[in-house]
UniProtKB/Swiss-Prot annotation:
GO molecular function, one term: DNA ligase (NAD+) activity
Protein family membership: Belongs to the NAD-dependent DNA ligase family. LigA subfamily.
Protein name, UniProt field: DNA ligase
Family matches, as HAMAP family: DNA_ligase_A
Residues that hold NAD(+) according to the record: 32-36, 81-82, 113, 136, 173, 290, 314
Residue intervals of the BRCT domain: 595-673
One of the Pfam families matching this protein, by short name: BRCT
Organism this protein belongs to: Serratia proteamaculans (strain 568)
Length: 673
């Protein structure tokens, strides 16, 4: 028995430590899956030995102590957490338990919602006015974050509509959309500021700022999902209908919430959300399944720390612990040298991960990473796996320092790091085989010259056999040469020659994008093409002339001019448009915005968030056809922002600058006007 008591005490100590790191310091040391594993072990031991359960066990409470820096708030109705299930079998067991408690075999109706990965908050409205906001804290006592929450534009300061209760406590999640998170971290890197490991940490850190002016600059948003205190009014006796009522009063509710009857419908909802997860624009880690009927909720009641009528149906963990075996350095299209960690293979989010990006030397230093370290690796959707933390206490004695190369690992050229930039680059240009391969892959890609059938493996063979040294060489390939490549028969070779010939008919914007100029993406290439109209005018433009192009600042102008000034690049461009190769595009058609009868004519428009009725490309094309200039970033020159679902930092910046904002439905209406 002594060993069991010791094991239980060790688990409790470890869990309390991780709760403090997660909830109070916003600096978790282990992924959620590791915490869940420890909690599962403790629950199993306490279940087998109920006489050892104590009131202060982590299984008996919700979270960690509140920060002393904030005033404390006592929740009149405790903010409980949820029990978890991790697979379909466990969910079906939960479903059966609920049926058994209700003594009914009838299909159960649930309200199914997204399990947002943010920070749970309580919003208290009195006579429709927001008077207090608080964190969950330990479920009984939280932190008063009213000043910070008032800066979140998604949260109404006053409810609108009829029959608003005298006192209503709404509960929900403050979170940070992925686009806003990425932009915030990018800005922090440029200013040597704090880099957040993930959007959840960023949201928690932002909402707990002692200075609300800092919170106001963070791209936070909110969805509500429930109610706590209710006085002086009534709410529907259906959870789903309550969400709809909240929506009518002006509170944001996710449009992915759905009422499902029977276990099959719930499982179908779970699978669909898991499939759509990467398209949402914000992080979730599962779905929440709640009995819809409030009377049945009250019948089922609660256990010590969670309701019996709800569960969190979690997705496979997106973070896991593994070990760094080695670090290698890869060279990209623009010469950027990226360190890549070779890992002990580990299952993350349903995929075996053996490599993870380390970004740059600054990131290695920030992490304090060494070869041999035990690390937390994260994989979210289709995002490249990355190391987000080091578990320093597990560092072995023989851990090795990571030395960034002074010479390119591919061609041996000097490595250069420009002052103010985080990225180190190979100076070899197209003499570097790695840069050559990536530049050619970009040149033939779908959004560039769009050479059908010219895949990565073909490019790699062409470079390795030295058949191709620059983009112009692609158009000198014959079917005979191509037939000598692996898995390339005469018919496939001729098809590829035909595809190369077809790709010569392109647009000026695609041609510029295909060249691979640093910082010149599709939108910038389109702006350059529209502004200058011809290649000759662009080639003659100095930096000041380039800066006159919409969304082209000092940095992009310098990169563009530097690219065009390089002798090898000039030679390749002239070869590509020469009579020998003959890449060409239609003469520019000048669109006079004043002559177009459209509400978008002459306006600089920015799209942000996820669109449901049109793809991003379709929306851009239709807006451009109606005389708009579609930009990739918000500035004082922006006239209009179109905000889709989970719009992030661009929406926040537009609101700060007082720029007009419309939603997708209004855009669709105006497109048809």
């Amino acid at each position: 028995m002594e060993s069991i008591i010791q094991q239980i005490n060790q688990l409790r100590t470890s869990l309390r430590h991780h709760e403090y790191q997660y909830h109070v310091l916003d600096a978790p040391e282990v992924p959620d899956a590791e915490y869940d594993r420890l909690m599962g072990e403790l629950r199993a031991l306490e279940s087998a030995h109920p006489e050892l359960i104590t009131a202060d066990s982590p299984t008996q409470r919700v979270g960690a102590a509140p920060l002393a820096a904030f005033d404390q708030v006592r929740h009149e109705v405790p903010m409980l957490s949820l029990d978890n299930v991790f697979d379909e079998e466990s969910f079906l067991a939960f479903y059966k338990r609920v049926q058994d408690r209700l003594k009914s075999s009838d299909p159960l109706t649930f309200c199914c919602e997204l399990k947002l990965d943010g920070l749970a908050v309580s919003l208290l409205y009195e006579d429709g006015e927001l008077v207090r906001a608080a964190t969950r804290g330990d479920g009984t006592t939280g932190e008063n974050i009213t000043s910070n929450v008032r800066t979140i534009r998604a949260i109404p300061l006053r409810l609108t509509g009829d029959n608003i209760p005298r006192r209503l406590e709404v509960r929900g999640e403050v979170f940070m959309p992925q686009a806003g998170f990425e932009q915030m971290n990018e800005e922090a890197r440029r200013k040597d500021g704090k880099i957040f490991a993930n959007p959840r940490n960023a949201a928690a850190g932002s909402i707990r700022q002692l200075d609300p002016r800092i919170t106001a600059k963070r791209p936070l948003t909110f969805f509500c999902y429930g109610v706590g205190l209710l006085e002086g009014g009534e709410l529907p006796r259906s959870h789903w209908q309550r969400l709809m009522q909240f929506k009518d009063w002006g509170l944001p509710v996710s449009d992915r919430a759905k009422r499902c009857t029977g276990s099959d419908e719930v499982l179908a909802f779970y699978r669909q959300v898991e499939q759509d997860r990467t398209q949402l624009g914000f992080d979730i880690d599962g779905v929440v399944v709640k009995i819809d009927d409030i009377d049945l909720q009250e019948t089922l009641g609660f256990v010590a720390r969670a309701p019996r009528w709800a569960t969190a149906f979690k997705f496979p963990a997106q973070e896991q612990i593994t070990q760094v075996r080695e670090v290698e350095f890869q060279v990209g299209r623009t010469g950027a040298i990226t360190p890549v960690a070779r890992l002990e293979p580990v299952l993350v989010a349903g995929v075996i991960v053996s490599n993870a990006t380390l970004h740059n030397a600054d990131e290695i230093e920030r992490l304090g990473l060494r070869i041999g370290d035990t690390v937390i690796v994260r994989r979210a959707g289709d995002v490249i796996p990355q190391v987000v933390g080091v578990i320093a206490e597990r560092r072995p004695a023989d851990a090795r320092e990571i030395l960034f190369p002074q010479h390119c690992p591919v061609c041996g050229s000097d490595v250069e790091r420009v002052e103010g930039e985080a990225v180190a680059r190979c100076t070899g240009g197209l003499i570097c085989a790695a840069q050559r391969k990536e530049a050619l892959k970009h040149f033939v890609s779908r959004r560039a010259l769009d050479v059908d059938g010219m895949g990565d493996k073909i490019i790699e063979q062409l470079v390795e056999k030295e058949y191709v040294k620059n983009p112009a060489d692609l158009f000198r390939l014959s079917a005979g040469i191509l037939t000598g490549l692996d898995r390339m028969g005469p018919k496939s070779a001729q098809n590829l020659v035909n595809a190369l010939e077809k790709s010569k008919q392109t647009t000026f914007a695609r041609f510029l994008y295909a060249l691979g100029i640093r910082e010149v993406g599709e939108a910038t290439a389109a702006n350059l093409a529209a502004h200058f109209g011809t290649l000759d005018k662009l080639l003659a433009a100095d930096i000041e002339a380039l800066k006159e192009v919409p969304e082209v600042g000092e940095i992009v102008a310098k990169h563009t001019r530097h690219f065009l000034d390089e002798e090898l690049n000039q030679q390749v461009i002239q070869e590509l448009v020469s009579d020998e190769i003959g890449i060409n595009w239609p003469a520019p058609v000048v669109i006079v915005a004043e002559e177009i009868d459209s509400p978008f004519a002459g306006k600089t428009v920015v799209l942000t968030g996820s669109l449901s009725q049109l793809s991003r490309d379709e929306a851009k094309d239709r807006l451009t056809a109606l005389g708009a200039k579609v930009s990739g970033s918000v500035s004082k020159k922006t006239d209009l922002v179109i905000a889709g679902e989970a719009a992030g930092s661009k929406l926040v910046k537009a609101q700060e600058l007082g720029i007009e904002v419309i939603d997708e439905a209004e855009m669709i209406r105006l497109l048809g006007a």
